[in-house]
Amino acid sequence: MNARDKKFMTAGIIIALIIAVLAPFLASPNPDGLESTAEKVMPNPETEPVLESPLPDYTLPALGDSPFGGVVSMVIGTILVLAIAYGVGAVFRGRKAAGEEGGEE
């Protein structure tokens, strides 16, 4: 990766983290269209989730509904998504390099 690409990636990560920090303060407390429609169609869901969310409703359970909990939750989520994307990219980059070494296209 050349220096220009590194600067581009660094700027993208910084922008993503800035958005993660500001998002809890800009988000509407009202439910979105899908959520409000689901509440109208099925007001009392009787099922339990198969898996509990680690960051339910973009908060950390230990911090409650505070904006700080939302900020920490968004930053953790952003870092996790970036790490997963990097890992998937590394796997495919490794496969491409292995295919080139073996003479396959």
UniProtKB/Swiss-Prot annotation:
Region (Disordered): 32-53
GO-annotated cellular components: plasma membrane
Chief location: membrane
Highest taxon of source: Archaea
Transmembrane segments: 8-28, 72-92
NCBIfam families with a match to the protein in the record: PRK06287.1-3 (NF004932)
Protein family (similarity comment): To M.jannaschii MJ1570.
Protein name per Swiss-Prot or TrEMBL: Uncharacterized protein MTH_1706
Taxonomic lineage of the native organism: Archaea, Methanobacteriati, Methanobacteriota, Methanomada group, Methanobacteria
